[in-house]
Amino acid sequence: MQDHQENDSKPSKERPRASAPLVYPVEPPEPGGALQRIADGLLWARIPMPIALNHINVYLLRDHDGWVIIDTGLQHEQSLLAWPKIAAAPELEGLPFKALICTHFHYDHGGMARWLCNTYGIPLYMSRAEHHTMRTNYQPFPAGPELPPAFVRFYGGAGVSTENLEKMATFLRQDPFITPPQESYIRLRRGDTLSIGQRQWQVLIGSGHSPEHVCLYCDQDPAQPLLIAGDQLISRISSNVPVNPSEPEANPLKDWLDSLDMLDTLAPKTWVMPAHQGVFTGLHLRTQELREHHAFQFDAIVDLLQQHGEMTAAQVMEAIFPKLRNPIDQLLAVGEVVAHLHHLMPVGRVRRRFDDAAQVYRFAAGAAAGDKPLFGVLRVQAAVV
């Protein structure tokens, strides 16, 4: 869960501590258009963002005749000021932008995609699921007195009050970063190889934070393997891994933890280039920290249910994060609490039932035979792969 949320938790046990510090081998660039060299033909810039997480890292990969951009920043004045500065920077040696790769669909990673593609005449590369989600999500929240039924079923079923549902909807209707998506794209698939300059980048796919998140990995230099990680691996925060109204039965934490297993196959010396915070080494240490973080959250939720009996997801959220006041933070936190509850159910640590009178789902510690699907009518046994 995000670090500002972690600070609001009231755990019953001591939170796990890192066994050794990560190493940050490169100083970050100044936000707003300055460039920092990471390796030959690999540059790092920071685009400011007017939110609590106040920047996004973008990277530029030199090809023979131009530069490939990784991620975009929010559709916002700060991005509109930064990108022309980057394009004119002497470090680019007069070469133009030639392509854009978006790791995933979230606004800070793809919000400027349409502008960049149109302004510089470049194509967009993404995975199919991320582009599809970009096209469906980059839409205004419906106006009018009636809230979308799926929104009400999911968050109302999680125990969010009618008053807070309205506050969340008002916040979403006022979203300042909504922007038309870039309609056309070129698909990236797991296992693809991108030849960019002297490097061969392998396309890796992660999931959990978003449906088909692209990471790029190059291990040609054993002394400096490189991973462009997006939001799949960040040094000090755990990316939001939520269940959403569009897929209310999802178990995204299983996908997230499976993606950590995939990242563990990479070289120990890998330089991790995340979308936020610093470039770091210590990949395997960080994946283990994240596993321990989620194990801690699982135990905290089960302890809470054992102490208080049945609770809705919203009640669990309020107990773990009592200081959250911003409607969007509460929305994200409810989705992530539901994700933790969903992950605990198949292993028999949590059960649920539907309260017909209140029209909410209540969770309790322990297993129960015959849990019915939250929103579906068919019981689906997950495949073992």
Predicted regions and their residues:
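Residue-level signal for the nucleotide or nucleotide-sugar donor/cofactor binding architecture
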Residues: G111, N251, L332
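C-terminal regulatory/interaction regions
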Residues: Q2-Y24, A300-V385
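Metallo-beta-lactamase
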Residues: W67-Q78, K167, F171-T179, E183-I186, ...
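Aromatic/hydrophobic pocket-lining residues that form the small-molecule binding cavity
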Residues: W83, W256, V337
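N-terminal amphipathic/basic leader segments beginning at the initiator methionine
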Residues: K13-L42
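Conserved beta-strand hairpin/beta-sheet module of binuclear metal-dependent hydrolase folds
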Residues: G32-L92, P96, C215-S235
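Short, contiguous alpha-helical
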Residues: N118, G206, M345
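Active-site HxH/HxHxD metal-binding segment of metal-dependent hydrolases
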Residues: D40, Q78-L80, P84-S195, A223-P225, ...
